[in-house]
Amino acid sequence: MKLLEPIKVGNIEFKNRIMFPPLTTGYEEKDGSIGEQSFRFYERLAKGGVGYIVIGDVAPLSTFSPTPKLYSPEQVQSFKRLADACHENGAKLGIQLFHPDYNVKALNDMFHQGKMQEARAKLHHDMQHFVNEVTAEELDEIIKHMENCAILAHEAGVDCIEVHGDRLVGSLCSPILNHRTDEYGGDLANRTRFALTLVKRLKTIVPDMVIDYKLPIVTPLGDNGFRGKGGLPLDEACIFAKELEAAGVDTLHVAQANHTGNMGDPIPAMGTQPYGFMVSYSKKIKELVSIPVSVVGRIVTPEAAEAVNGSADIVALGRSLLTDPDFANKCADGHCCDVRTCMMCNKGCTDNIQNRAFLSCVLNAENGYETSRQITPAVTAKRIAIIGAGIAGLEAARVAALRGHQVTIFEKSLQIGGQLLIASVPPRKEEMMRSINYYLNVLPELSVTFRLGQEFTGKDYDSFDEVIVATGATNAIIPVPGKDLPIVTSAWDILAKKEIVFGNVSVIGGGLVGVETAEYLAARGCNVTIIEMMDQIAKEESSTILPTLMSELEHSNVQILTSAKLSEINDHAVIVEKTENEKTSVLEIRSDFVVMAVGARKNLPDLSACPLPLHYIGDCAGERPSNIDHAIKSAYDAACEI
């Protein structure tokens, strides 16, 4: 594979063309140094075979932002420890150098003085206006901070500096955000002056280090719109790329511009952007420069990464490496089909970062927990029965088998997948099935036995030592008058294609299942009304998918009733109590069919006579059904305890 060939970048060589791009992780210590969680995360990527690893958002001064920081000699050792670990595993390490879009000193002073309200107001103001208010003298001071950071990185043994071409640097370059009238505003030459000055000074101060530049490109959206603000449109990016090469940049990292407040622009979720949506842009840049070009953006599989050849020299895999840090090693060993591929849900990664939690992946229980979650051989090999072949049962089987247990999965239906078989049916959700295909590939290799169409019964007890129960949940029904009428069905039965509805359909419940079912039915010609007790629908949906979802509902003329409680169902309508401005009115909504999507209840088999140790995982464990993240983690942990 071309993907696995070495490549010369500046004065160093990457062992392959697989890059872990800069991502905010939330793992760093309070002072921004590399602590144990951060160290183990990046070390795991290096052990997995990644050729080039970049630490995202490294600030060159003390800020209150939850990002890595490198501004003091006391922090060098933590970065050196990581650089050494990367080198021991054949990887090169880079840091992404950036400056926040705000006046760091002013905000730090406000926070230290306890002026929280003023600080929040200042931050909000600066995020909109700092690019135009920061003085030329302050910009020069910022470059000095960045030079100091680069010197410290060099002392730590870091190989590369990636200039973050978004954030402050990208705002200055941007024709959309930059409204300055001095030497840093106006035409392209002025807007890129700071970036080029920074690059030249970095080349002077750390001549032995590779200089990478993240080149964010503003892309078209519809007829007159655009995605991203903190970057350049393609025509200007092409000119700027050649100027960056002339200034001494060793490699360019082509990416979608950000700075819109919607992380779905640079990190699009399932079905919201084509696969490899930035590859055509990297191809144009590559045609203009002689230095290596990397590209990032919805490149999911080894085959897709290999297909980038000719359009970019290096492939950046962010979410894909969170899902499977052994991506490179599996490719090198000829086991591409065993790569666990990202389903682009953005739940554990992008949403977590936006919610000020740390980076993780819902499909990889070890991600972010590399120190505490490791698969080790079992003390005693046992015969394990797993009841249920949903994603929790499948993950438990994988982990238990890797630990040396003999695993048999009982599944009463004739196919594996559980709830993901229906969760993948609504528009844009088919990518979820990749997670099931992964288990179809790896479990037979681990000698896991499947008993499809069979239930676990008393006659099986003597054949096993312990049992993992992963029987999931079932669709709940609201106990209102009329709930047993033939026009009433469940969202799960609709998505499983067990029931067909038409005409006017009322979907009871505006959670994620209800809203996705509504979109699914509207796309098939139904006139749909969503009835939700709360004041908002789809609260569980990723913020990177929600705008697309709401736009599709509006386009399909789906009616939405919030703060509305179902009280009765009759043969031709649902009766709803709608509360607005503390006043409640009764509405009758014509309905040919009523679809219940009001949550789930645990599905617990009767195992009272089973003498074996029982371990409950996934939706059938805990107080109430949960989500994929809980299913995977509970399965992993249970399998590691046996």
Locate the predicted segments by residue:
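Short gly/ser/thr-rich secondary-structure transition/capping motifs
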Residues: M1-I7, E36, E366-E370, S447-Q454, ...
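Generic hydrophobic alpha-helical scaffold/packing signal
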Residues: A241, E245, S282-K286, N309, ...
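Rossmann-like dinucleotide/flavin-binding elements
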Residues: A381-I409, R451-K459, S463, A470-V480, ...
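Short loop/edge segments at beta-strand edges and connector loops
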Residues: G297, I436, L452-E455, S490-W492, ...
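Active-site acidic short loop of glycosyltransferases
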Residues: D208, S290-I291, F464, F502, ...
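Rossmann-like dinucleotide-binding cores of NAD(P)H-dependent redox enzymes
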Residues: I409-T449, Y520-L566, G622-R624
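Flavin-dependent oxidoreductase catalytic cores
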Residues: M1-I387, I391, E395-V407, Q415, ...
